[in-house]
């Protein structure tokens, strides 16, 4: 009944929420005899028939045909000091972890031309990390290489930040956009070509598990569809992570670096879309910041060579 923990006057809030996604898609299945659900980032596939209440005729995840390897996915699990990096609850505010994330950002801002997009699991976590980076002098270092812009819950402010970001990328100053994995930026804004040469996922974008709405949904999924809480949370987080990474690759002649910065991604990489797994060798799944930087530099050197017209035919 209280809005916050410190409030003394009861102020009840009534939430209406749809726990069953099958309700929304049911009219589509009733009206059409054949329905195709397709996307580059709807993996792992097994969860959708369960949650939406349908049986599949064909369920397939495909790899991607590329004339050259135009994106570089990698999992960074350690900082330069070999300490583990993660947004896990126990160590998320550990100064050593925050500094390692800061070093990762600095190194990638140094080597990446034009635009860098960084996704955090939540606004709260992003704000606490930014203030700690400010105290450590990390933002001052990043500022030398890129303009720093931050997404906020206010959509007008965010639109203005995006406009400034694009201008900075166009005029050669370069920019880094700090945003949230479930915010406006991650959902429908493309960072094609020079607007997104590197995307960094800082931490696994799990939902806030203390939310009453989420708890109700998890209980519903467990009782109705026999979907375990952890399975759903993991599926949901990896789907959002893949969606964030997919923002940088928007065409056959586009290229970009995709960084998953959390040791927990190591065990979850088989939940990424097949086309990402296809270009993620074992050697790139347990990297330190220094190793990741070296691999990224090599990749960008290869990408700087002009793409011959003949290689583009038939793709």
Walk through the language-model features, giving the residues of each:
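ASCE RecA-like P-loop NTPase motor cores
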Residues: 1-315
């Amino acid at each position: 009944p209280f809005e916050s923990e410190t409030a003394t006057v009861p102020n009840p809030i009534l939430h209406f929420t749809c726990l069953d996604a099958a309700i929304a898609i049911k009219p589509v299945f009733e009206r059409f005899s054949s329905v195709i659900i397709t996307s580059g980032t709807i993996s792992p596939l097994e969860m959708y028939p369960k949650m939406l209440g349908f049986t599949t005729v064909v369920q397939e995840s495909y790899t991607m045909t590329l004339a050259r390897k135009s994106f570089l996915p990698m999992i960074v699990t350690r900082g330069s000091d070999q300490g583990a990096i993660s947004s896990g609850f126990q160590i998320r505010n550990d100064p050593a972890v925050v500094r390692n994330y800061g070093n990762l950002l600095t190194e990638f801002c140094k080597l990446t031309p034009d635009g860098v997009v960084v996704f955090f699991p939540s606004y709260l976590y992003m704000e606490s990390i930014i203030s700690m980076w400010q105290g450590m002098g990390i933002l001052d270092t990043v500022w030398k290489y890129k303009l720093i812009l931050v997404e906020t819950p206010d959509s007008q402010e965010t639109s203005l930040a995006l406009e400034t970001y694009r201008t900075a990328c166009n005029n050669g100053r370069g920019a880094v956009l700090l945003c949230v994995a479930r915010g406006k930026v991650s959902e429908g804004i493309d960072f094609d070509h020079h607007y997104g040469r590197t995307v960094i996922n800082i931490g696994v974008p799990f939902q806030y598990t203390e939310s009453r709405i989420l708890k109700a949904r998890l209980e519903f999924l467990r009782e109705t569809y026999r979907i375990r809480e952890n399975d759903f949370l993991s599926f949901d987080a990896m789907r959002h992570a893949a969606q964030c990474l997919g923002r940088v690759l928007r065409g056959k002649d586009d290229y970009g670096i995709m960084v998953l910065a959390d040791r927990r991604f190591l065990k979850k990489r088989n939940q990424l879309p097949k086309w990402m797994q296809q270009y993620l060798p074992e050697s790139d799944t347990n990297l330190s910041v220094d190793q990741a930087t070296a691999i990224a530099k090599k990749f960008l050197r290869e990408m700087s060579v002009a793409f011959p017209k003949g290689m583009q035919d038939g793709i």
